Design a protein with these regions (language model features):
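A residue-level signal for conserved active-site and pocket-lining positions in enzyme catalytic cores
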Residues: 14, 55, 59, 81, ...
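Short glycine/serine/threonine-rich phosphate/pyrophosphate-binding segments
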Residues: 61-67, 174-179
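Gly/Ser/Thr-rich active-site loops/lids in small-molecule metabolic enzymes
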Residues: 159-203
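Proline-centered loop/turn at the N-terminus of a beta-strand
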Residues: 74-76
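ATP/nucleoside-binding phosphotransfer catalytic cores, i.e., glycine-rich phosphate-binding loops
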Residues: 137, 153-156, 205-278
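ATP/NTP phosphate-donor binding region
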Residues: 1-53, 57, 65, 94-109, ...
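Catalytic core of DAGKc-family lipid kinases
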Residues: 85-163
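A generic structural signal for short beta-strands and their flanking turns/coil linkers
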Residues: 51, 112-116, 131-133, 144-148, ...
Length: 278
C-alpha cells in the first residue's frame, strides 16, 4: 500500500468522553512527528474533505456517526477504541503508536463496508437515512407487542407480532442483531440479516437475505407508537399503515484494515469464545 498519499490526517472524537481530547492531542503529536499534517478543528464531514485519513476516537457509536456524517466521501476511517466492546474501533488506545507506524509503513489495506438505506413516509414526513449497522422498527415506551407486515422483493414474508424488527447490514451483524439472536456474518458478506426482537411466535427466526433485496416494513398498529431508529438514533415515528423501505445504499464507507488484524480473531477476543475442552 502506497503511503505517500496519506499526508493529511483528520482527528475526531467523542466529546462526551473526557479521555478523548487527550488522546487526540497525543495522536496529533504522533502524526506531526511522522511528517504528516494533523487537522483537529471541524466536524467529520469538513475534515473528510481536507484529510486523506480520519482517525476516530471513541466507541462504535462514534464510528457509526462519523460514517454517516462523511457519507459519499472516499476518505477512509481508522477507529481508536476508548469505549466498550468496539468492533468498529479496531485499535486499542494503548496501541495507537504501533497502529500509526503500521499505517506509515503501508501495512494495511482498505476494507469496503456497505451502507444500507431506509426511506418512506413517517407521520406525514418523508424520510431518507443511511446506516452502517442497522435500521430498527420497534415499539415505543409502551411495553406491548406491535404488528409489522414485512415483504421482500414484493413477496410477503409474514406479519410479525414482536417488540420490533432489526434490518442489519453485514457490519451490524455483531451489534443489536446478535443480541436478538441473529447470526454473525463476515462484514464483507453481501447480505442483510432480518431479525425479530422478542417475537411472539417461536418459529420467527432471523433470516439472511441477499444485499440487493428490497425490504418493505409496514406498521399495523393504530393505537400504539412505533419507532424508526437508524444506528441507534430515533429518526421518526410511524403512524398506522405507514411503511418504510430498506435497501442497499449506493454509498459505501472505507475502513482501514491493519495487516495484523483479523475479524475472526476479534470475534474470539471480544465475545470471549473459549471453545470446549474435554
Amino acid at each position: 500500500m502506497k503511503t505517500d498519499k496519506i499526508k493529511r490526517v483528520g482527528l475526531i472524537g467523542n466529546t462526551q468522553k473526557p479521555e478523548s481530547a487527550g488522546m487526540i492531542r497525543k495522536a496529533a503529536r504522533l502524526v506531526e512527528r511522522a511528517g504528516r499534517k494533523a487537522f483537529v478543528d471541524g466536524d467529520a464531514a469538513s475534515l473528510a474533505r481536507e484529510a486523506d485519513l480520519l482517525l476516530v476516537f471513541g466507541g462504535d457509536g462514534t464510528m457509526l456517526k462519523a460514517a454517516r456524517d462523511i457519507e459519499g466521501s472516499k476518505t477512509p476511517l481508522l477507529g481508536i477504541n476508548i469505549g466498550g466492546l468496539g468492533f468498529l474501533t479496531a485499535v486499542s488506545s494503548k496501541d495507537l503508536p504501533k497502529a500509526l507506524e503500521q499505517v506509515w509503513k503501508g501495512n494495511f489495506s482498505y476494507e469496503t463496508r456497505a451502507l444500507i438505506e431506509v426511506s418512506g413516509r413517517c407521520s406525514g414526513r418523508q424520510i431518507r437515512q443511511s446506516a452502517l449497522n442497522d435500521i430498527v422498527v420497534s415499539r415505543g415506551a409502551l411495553s406491548r407487542l406491535i404488528s409489522l407486515d414485512v415483504s421482500v422483493n414484493g413477496e410477503h414474508i409474514t406479519r410479525y407480532r414482536c417488540d420490533g424488527l432489526i434490518v442489519s447490514s453485514p457490519t451490524g451483524s455483531t451489534a443489536y442483531s446478535l443480541a436478538a439472536g441473529g447470526a454473525v456474518v463476515l462484514p464483507t458478506a453481501e447480505v442483510f440479516a432480518l431479525t425479530p426482537i422478542c417475537p411472539h411466535a417461536l418459529s420467527n427466526r432471523s433470516i439472511i437475505l441477499p444485499l440487493n433485496s428490497t425490504i418493505r416494513i409496514q406498521a399495523m398498529n393504530p393505537a400504539r407508537a412505533t419507532i424508526l431508529s437508524v444506528d441507534g438514533e430515533v429518526v421518526a415515528e410511524l403512524d398506522a399503515n405507514d411503511e418504510v423501505t430498506v435497501r442497499r445504499s449506493t454509498n459505501i464507507v472505507r475502513l482501514v484494515h491493519l495487516a495484523d488484524s483479523s475479524f475472526l480473531e476479534t470475534l474470539r477476543r471480544k465475545l470471549q469464545w473459549r471453545g470446549a475442552y474435554f
